[in-house]
């Protein structure tokens, strides 16, 4: 087990992958296989909200996310402590997270009053002051009306794997709504991306201020070409919808479908690429007439 120096359990993102590690003796291998299996990945995702947006509701001022799931963190703590007591590793383990990137998007109107404060925290601080405070100035406040934006945090140290006042110590993200008025609707959504590693050797890192990048909302009408704009207008005015059989029409008078180029919801508006499609109403009759077979 002495060859364990670092483990990469997962990345917290919408494309979360777990890298299996085959290290140490047979007992350690069994434990690691269990911790990094596909079944474990599902547990990580469920407990940490990996790959999912966190909804910020008006009636819930505070939200917290641990950057390592509780069950997985406890297993790592137990494994490293056991190997440390045997003299196989130089420490009982630390959690290393180089950086955390958060994407915030507004789900309320642009004149919504209030702001969001986001903090990178170390859960040990809750045992001292009953309040999760930002570590090393890793805190940023943004007005709801200024969204969308991206925020980056970076801790200056590795978090020790240990229990403090009966709670597992871990890095986490806290979001706090300020001055938001409402009865429970979602005012914004947050998606966090990060990479977690477990190491036996701790480190310290240069202190940097939180970085924020505001994103200009997409102006559909300004960015579309004349052809795309024409298709867009036809689409929203229902001129391109196929309503199927019309009352009073005969089988010989049914008009053929017309393909209209419209803005593709999955294509990049900047590239000018659009997809050719025909819209239809669910449940409407199909107007296509089968061609007669030649004998």
Curated annotation (Swiss-Prot):
Alphabetical GO CC annotations of the entry are: host cell plasmodesma
Family note = Belongs to the bromovirus movement protein family.
- Which subcellular locations apply to this protein? Host cell junction, Host plasmodesma
Give the species.
Broad bean mottle virus
The opening ranks of the lineage are: Viruses, Riboviria, Orthornavirae, Kitrinoviricota, Alsuviricetes
Q: Does the keyword Transport apply?
A: yes
Keywords on record: Host cell junction, Transport, Viral movement protein
Query: Domain of life here?
Result: Viruses
Q: Mention one GO biological process in which this protein takes part, according to its record.
A: transport of virus in host, cell to cell
Put simply, this protein is called: Movement protein
Please state the protein's primary subcellular location: host cell
Chain intervals with Polar residues compositional bias:
266-281
Ranges for region Disordered: 256-295
UniProt keyword Cytoplasm, yes or no = no
Protein purpose: Transports viral genome to neighboring plant cells directly through plasmosdesmata, without any budding. The movement protein allows efficient cell to cell propagation, by bypassing the host cell wall barrier. Acts by forming a tubular structure at the host plasmodesmata, enlarging it enough to allow free passage of virion capsids.
């Amino acid at each position: 087990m002495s060859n364990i120096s670092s483990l990469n359990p997962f990345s917290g993102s919408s494309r979360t992958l777990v890298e299996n590690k085959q290290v140490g003796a047979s007992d350690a291998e069994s434990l690691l296989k269990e911790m990094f299996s596909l079944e474990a990945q599902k547990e990580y995702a469920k407990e940490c909200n990996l790959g999912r947006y966190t909804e910020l509701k008006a009636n819930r001022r505070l939200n917290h996310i641990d950057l390592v799931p509780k069950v997985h963190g406890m297993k790592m703590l137990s494994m490293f402590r056991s190997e440390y007591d045997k003299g196989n590793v130089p420490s009982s383990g630390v959690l290393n997270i180089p950086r955390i990137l958060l994407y915030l998007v507004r789900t309320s109107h642009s004149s919504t009053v209030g702001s969001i404060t986001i903090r990178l925290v170390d859960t040990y601080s809750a045992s001292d002051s009953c309040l999760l405070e930002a570590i090393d100035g890793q805190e940023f406040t943004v007005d709801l009306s200024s969204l969308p934006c991206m925020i980056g945090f970076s801790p200056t140290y590795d978090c020790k794997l240990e229990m403090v006042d009966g709670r597992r110590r871990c890095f986490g993200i806290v979001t706090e709504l300020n001055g938001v008025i409402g009865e429970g609707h979602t005012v914004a959504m947050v998606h966090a991306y990060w990479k977690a590693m477990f190491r036996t050797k701790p480190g310290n890192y240069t202190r940097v201020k939180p970085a924020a990048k505001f994103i200009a909302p997409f102006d559909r009408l300004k960015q579309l070409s004349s052809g795309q704009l024409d298709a867009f207008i036809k689409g929203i005015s229902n001129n391109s919808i196929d309503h199927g059989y019309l009352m009073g029409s005969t089988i010989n008078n049914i008009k053929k479908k017309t393909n209209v180029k419209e803005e593709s919801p999955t294509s990049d508006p900047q590239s000018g690429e659009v997809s050719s499609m025909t819209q239809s109403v669910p449940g409407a009759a199909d107007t296509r007439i089968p061609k007669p077979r030649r004998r």
